[in-house]
Design a protein with these regions (language model features):
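Bacterial N-terminal signal peptides that target proteins for export
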Residues: 2-10
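C-terminal motif of bacterial Sec signal peptides marking the signal peptidase cleavage site
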Residues: 19-23
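N-terminal hydrophobic targeting/anchoring segments and the immediately downstream early-domain regions
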Residues: 27-130, 134-139
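Short, well-ordered coil/turn segments that N-cap beta-strands
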Residues: 69, 94, 124-128, 176-178, ...
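Enzymes and membrane/adaptor proteins characterized by extended Gly/Ser/Thr/Asp/Glu-rich
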Residues: 87-204, 223-240, 269-284, 301, ...
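Phosphate/pyrophosphate-binding betaalpha-module
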Residues: 207-208, 212-223, 244-263
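Catalytic PLP-binding core of fold-type I/II PLP enzymes
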Residues: 290-303, 307
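Mid-to-C-terminal alpha-helical segments outside catalytic/metal-binding sites
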Residues: 352, 356-382
Length: 382
């Protein structure tokens, strides 16, 4: 009899264990199903305020998605074939910047940008930046409105600048771009700067970006804090900052103060200013990005690097290591060229840095939040 009861009790215990385990499995599956049903499009199209949308999506994002949002890449070719789609999907990148290699004619460009967007949407990715550096488009390219060379803009009257900027913004928008790398805020750089006058440079930049905003395009002022110091040398950080604050940085200060938040980003140059940071280029310098730009000048938006392979070469570092250093210094978005080896190396380095805590979850989420605060602005939805 005792043996009988022992068997019954054992059976009941087993039944309870099975039921309990099954319940846990159902609960786990339900939780997983809940996660699966939270889509980027659903969050984006909800009636929540943008900051709430951002927090909701950050909580739902995988580490893979977050790391991808730190990368803006370029692609080879004039069409989006399977290999290009595979790169976009594999690395789940924040955006794609088209270069002259990708720009053949208007219809081809429209198809190219549309295919990028559709690849992202069908892969449940965050809205991608589809960017073009307008000042770097070759003048012989018949696909685009012929604009003045950069160093000629400053010689034009304001009504002409506004007219050309308006036509260019409409053209880029209609081709499928949503981000312009530009305008340029630097002073006195041959073949790059619009003018040497900081006041006039500010006027030109603000006039251009007003046309971009009207046509629902994001933009990126470049290059902070400067691209050259000429013959200037400095004995201290304060001396260097004072000099630049009367030159290029004077323009950036005005642009930061007078431009709508979350509509633009700043691009870092690869200049080195030893008086401020004797070890790092500006694009990987915490004293310049986090200290000067963010804390002293009060800039709260996205910081993007210029091409990271160039910075890595100048600093004699591996491209992946340089990308990690740039994020740790305060950058949010790493610009990578079309070399798939470079893309993979940067992605691997960032993934490893997040996994081992070199880039903390808090630091990672800071960048993701800045990027999403821009991308989730409703007027910019694809």
């Amino acid at each position: 009899m005792n043996q009988f009861f022992r068997r019954v009790l054992s059976g009941l215990a087993l039944l309870v264990a099975v039921v309990g385990t099954t319940g846990c499995q159902h609960e786990s599956q339900a939780e997983q199903e809940t996660v699966r049903t939270v889509s980027y499009r659903a969050v984006l199209e909800s009636n929540k305020p943008v900051p709430e949308k951002v927090d909701t999506w950050i909580a739902a994002m995988s580490q893979e998605d977050k790391v991808g949002q730190l990368m803006m890449i370029s692609l080879h070719g004039s069409t989006i074939g399977q290999s290009q789609k595979d790169v976009i999907r594999k690395y789940r990148v924040s955006g794609v910047m088209l270069t002259n290699e990708n720009l053949i004619n208007k219809n081809q460009v429209k198809t190219f940008t549309s295919d990028i967007m559709q690849t992202a949407i069908t892969s449940s990715m965050v809205t991608p930046y589809i960017a073009v550096h307008r000042d770097r488009i070759l003048h012989g390219n018949e696909s685009f409105l012929r604009l003045p060379k950069p160093n000629r803009w400053g010689q034009l009257p304001m009504d002409r600048i506004i007219n050309l900027a308006t036509r260019s913004a409409i053209e880029m928008r209609d081709m499928g771009f949503n981000l312009v790398i530009g305008p340029n805020a630097n002073l006195g750089v041959p073949n790059m700067s619009y003018t040497s006058d900081p006041t006039w440079a500010g006027h030109i930049n603000l006039a251009m970006v007003e046309r971009y905003q009207i046509n629902h395009m994001w933009f990126a002022y470049n290059y902070f804090p400067a691209v050259t110091l000429g013959d200037a040398s400095f004995g201290s950080a304060n001396e260097a900052k004072a000099y630049l604050s009367n030159n290029d940085v004077a323009v950036f200060k005005r642009l930061i103060a007078q431009t709508t938040a979350n509509s633009y980003m700043l691009v870092m140059s690869h200049i080195q200013i030893p008086a401020i940071d004797n070890e790092h280029l500006a694009s990987s310098s915490k004293p310049i990005i986090d200290g000067w730009l963010r804390k002293e000048l009060g800039y709260k938006g996205i910081v993007m690097t210029d091409r990271i392979d160039v910075g890595a070469l100048q600093s004699n570092q591996k491209i992946g290591d340089y990308a990690v250093a740039s994020i740790l210094a305060g950058s949010d978005l790493i610009l990578v060229d079309a070399d798939t080896i470079h893309i993979d190396e940067v992605h691997r380095a960032l993934t490893q840095a997040v996994a081992d805590g070199t880039i903390s979850t808090e630091r990672l989420n800071e960048s993701i939040k800045r990027i999403l605060l821009m991308k989730m602005q409703t007027q910019m939805d694809p």
